Amino acid sequence: LVNGTAAIHLALILADVGEGDEVLAPTFTFVATANAISYLKATPHFVDNNEDTLGVDPKKLYEYLNKFTKQKDGKCINLKTNKIIKAIIPTHVFGHPCKIDEIVDIARKFNILVIEDAAESIGSYYKNKHTGTFGLMGALSFNGNKTITTGGGGAILTNNKEIAKKAKHLSTTAKLDHKWDYLHDEIGFNYRLPNIN
């Protein structure tokens, strides 16, 4: 993809986040996280960070969700706003993994999808597993200040073949295969990595 922000944006679309939804994000993250949520007219809802990992604090996350949400029809509802909390974007800050296994377990309990922001943690492991591979999707960045760079760029990681197929389709302007005609079956994005990168 063209950058890490596009990766987060597209991952949110693939997670069916839309207008009126809420997405949990850490208080310590790059502005791209809140921007990508806002592009979809969803609301960024910030959760506390752990001072040891700098990532989302699983204990505080659980306490908050347990106290201020309810389950209705398989969805997590914020009791204060009555909006659906559809996803959480935990960030692995400065290459240091957050307690992602605990966050994923809590998210599952509350029916919240996990999209990892692994933009700063390419090559990092947590409990012998690469960061960005614990949730439904992971977002990477290849910006000039990252461990691996292409001058710019990003990627989505997923083990879900349908999500991968849809990500490829949407990131290439939703163009259908055709020998000579430009046919598009839905609104897509020109998010593919530039040829020169």
Language-model region placement:
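Active-site region of PLP-dependent enzymes
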Residues: 121-127, 134-197
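PLP-dependent aminotransferase-like
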Residues: 13-93, 97-109, 113-118, 125
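Conserved N-terminal alpha-helix of the aminotransferase class I/II PLP-enzyme fold
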Residues: 1-6, 28
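Short, conserved alpha-helix that lines the donor NDP-sugar binding/gating region
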Residues: 8-12
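Short, hinge-like loop/turn segments at secondary-structure boundaries
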Residues: 63-64, 130-134
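Short, acidic/glycine-rich phosphate-metal binding loop used to engage nucleotide
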Residues: 4, 50-51, 128, 144
